[in-house]
Amino acid sequence: MSTRPYPWHPLRHWLEGWRRQRLLRQLADPALAFVLGPAPPDEWVSLDCETTGLDVRRDHIVSIGAVRIQGQRILTSQRLELLVRPPHGVSADSVRIHQLRERDLAQGLPVQDAVLQLLHFIGSRPLVGYYLEFDLAMINRVLRPLLGIALPQPRNEVSALYYDHKFRQLPPHRQQSPEIDLRFDTLMRDLGLPQSRAHDAVNDAVMAALAFIKLRQLQGAR
């Protein structure tokens, strides 16, 4: 889901406070309450995971990449790159996609340590990603037992923002049954953005951040 700013309203303010208090009570460790604090203004974290497959119940994270965004800038000096040691070997198909072999991952972090590092890197900043739902499902499967809750930060889904952008450009008669290509290559090419040939988590996070910034510019940073 994408987040959009709303004008301040007493009921909305009360509901947000109520939700925060409810989540605070569910936290497994009070030291992690920073995830529910106020986010730094005009900052986000773009993230991506590489995994052994697409089954959120059975597959495993092998790398995590994240980068901070501030206003219209990607803070490449503030990025996170983590290799994760999976409990089982990686298949040949998996290696062909993310180029991470078993020996590359042998010195990786245990997944619990990796997601806790990610949690501290994110803080309370809203999240950005391309098909973020999958990445968060993989992360939350590990994090929920440690944190007591799923990642509570607002989400900005790049494919949804792009869909909204393209939908607004369609004439009314085509808005009834729109056909909008949401493939990442198409999205990046249409937005006039460069694509990295490297397929790894941090590069994918940077490209999602580029698309997010461009789409905000096209929307007038509403």
Question: What residue spans do the PLM features occupy?
Answer:
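Long, acidic (Asp/Glu-rich), low-complexity accessory segments flanking structured domains
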Residues: 1-9
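Conserved non-catalytic scaffold segment of RNase H-like nuclease domains
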Residues: 14-17, 21-140, 144-152, 178-199
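Short, glycine/acidic-enriched loop or turn micro-motifs at the edges of active sites
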Residues: 49-53, 160, 207
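The feature marks non-catalytic terminal segments
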Residues: 216-222
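Short alpha-helix plus adjacent loop in nuclease-associated cores
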Residues: 156-176
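Conserved protein kinase catalytic core
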Residues: 54-56, 163, 210
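Acidic, divalent-metal-coordinating active-site segment for phosphoryl/phosphodiester hydrolysis
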Residues: 203-211
